[in-house]
């Protein structure tokens, strides 16, 4: 019974990763700017012939390495982040191949992609957290920095996202002479995704409470 529950949690996590990657792909293909966490990887992808997934994997492995240095431990949670990141990176490349870019598309479709991307990405993150199996290195490093510095997770997350966006913007300016891959969509996703995750989490908790109450009555 316990093994079945564990497998279910892993399944939920994998579905969450797949959905989160889809949301990121919609944001990236909107041509309005990708998510802050994916900004460096996506700008490098636009500037070279290397896939976004490969850059995503490399960036996340860097985050994991810093996490290990700061915590001085490499347990099963860290080990799990490696295959999880691999699947996540693969899913990003998959969705980018399937979802057409709106670089030269009408503004209405760009906005539609942005509107789709934020809630889809938030749903994926919510499922990843709900599964409680492991976390991706991009979130893990923020958690570690917050714990080490005694700061609030939310504040560190904002600072981390701003830092990545700034780095991506510098790379874009040096490579293209303008912002490319970073834009209003990056700002919107930074503001919206966290709030949507909170909303989804509350809905899931209420649903679970209702089911538990119904079970108790029966």
Model-predicted regions and their roles:
Residues 1-218:
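Core subunits and conserved enzymes of cellular information-processing
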């Amino acid at each position: 019974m316990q093994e079945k529950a564990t497998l279910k949690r892993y399944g939920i996590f994998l579905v969450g990763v797949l959905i989160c990657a889809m949301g990121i792909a919609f944001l990236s293909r909107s041509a309005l700017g990708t998510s802050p966490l994916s900004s460096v990887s996506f700008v490098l992808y636009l500037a070279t012939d290397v896939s976004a997934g490969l850059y995503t994997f490399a960036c996340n492995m860097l985050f994991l390495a810093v996490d290990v240095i700061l915590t001085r431990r490499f347990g099963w949670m860290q080990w799990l982040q490696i295959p999880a990141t691999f699947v996540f990176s693969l899913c990003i490349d998959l969705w980018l191949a399937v979802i057409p870019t709106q670089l030269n598309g009408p503004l209405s479709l760009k906005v539609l992609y942005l509107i789709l991307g934020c809630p889809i990405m938030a749903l994926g993150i919510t499922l990843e957290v709900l599964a409680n199996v492991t976390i991706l290195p991009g979130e893990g490093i923020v958690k570690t920095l917050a714990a080490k510095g005694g700061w609030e997770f939310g504040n560190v997350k904002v600072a981390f996202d701003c830092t990545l966006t700034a780095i991506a913007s510098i790379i874009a300016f040096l490579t293209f002479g303008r912002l490319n891959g970073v834009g209003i969509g990056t700002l919107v996703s930074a503001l919206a995704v966290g709030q949507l995750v909170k909303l989804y989490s509350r809905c899931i908790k209420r649903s679970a409470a209702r089911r538990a109450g119904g079970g108790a009555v029966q």
